Amino acid sequence: MVLLAASCRSGGGYTSADPNGRPTPRRLAPAQSGAAAGADLYDPAKGVVTVDDLDRLRQRILVVPVLGAYPVDVPNSFLEGRSNGRRHNAADILAPRGTPVLSADDGVIRRLSTNALGGITIYATDPDERFVYYYAHLDGYAPDLHVEQRVRRGDVLGYVGTTGNAPVNVPHLHFQIMRLLDRDRLWDGVPIDPKPFLQLPGALR
């Protein structure tokens, strides 16, 4: 059995200048509307998530993005503290190294990158580009995975590992959901607690 443990602000019209010195318009995600959601379900230090956002996310019917994992096992780790005063803002899904990491939703692969914190990572968006799904500490990518690839819920994206700042003896998937605000800054959205929205067990499509 798999065990589970546990800024971008809207506004502005321009990003950094292009190589010719001209400002380039920001590519904003779908606009928000309605009342703000309860602050226990997102990180208000990063921006606002509305009740409408959460309703739309719930309608996505996400799967737990690790093969063999179940929603009931997902911990309440979103609010946990981390070093340097950071909040976790994610769910850590423990599984043996090499366990398939699955696409939580239909959507598009937007960025494949490696960094010191997340290690081997994937950024994907839902079909409406309203939400970002971030998968980190991977051991590697699925064969032929590429940017702009369309994926379906339950497709294999990669494999659980310990890359980045993950403990070498604790392979896991760091999974984060963000409300996308700027399409050019996928990493800089508003984190949303994954637990209430992972409704189906991790199974292959």
Annotate each predicted stretch with a short phrase.
Residues L94, T125-P127, M178-L180:
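A generic structural motif
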Residues Q149-R205:
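Conserved, short, structured surface segments that act as functional micro-motifs
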Residues S7-G12:
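Bacterial signal peptide processing site
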Residues Y14-I120, R153, T162, I192-R205:
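Surface-exposed, glycine-biased beta-strand/turn segments
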Residues N89-D92, F131-Y134, L181-D188:
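Small beta-barrel nucleic-acid-binding modules, principally OB-folds
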Residues M1-A6:
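Sec-dependent bacterial lipoprotein signal peptides
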Residues S103-V147, V170-H174:
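Zn2+-dependent peptidoglycan hydrolase active-site motif and core
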Residues D55-R58, Y135-V147, R153-T162:
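Generic detector of contiguous secondary-structure segments
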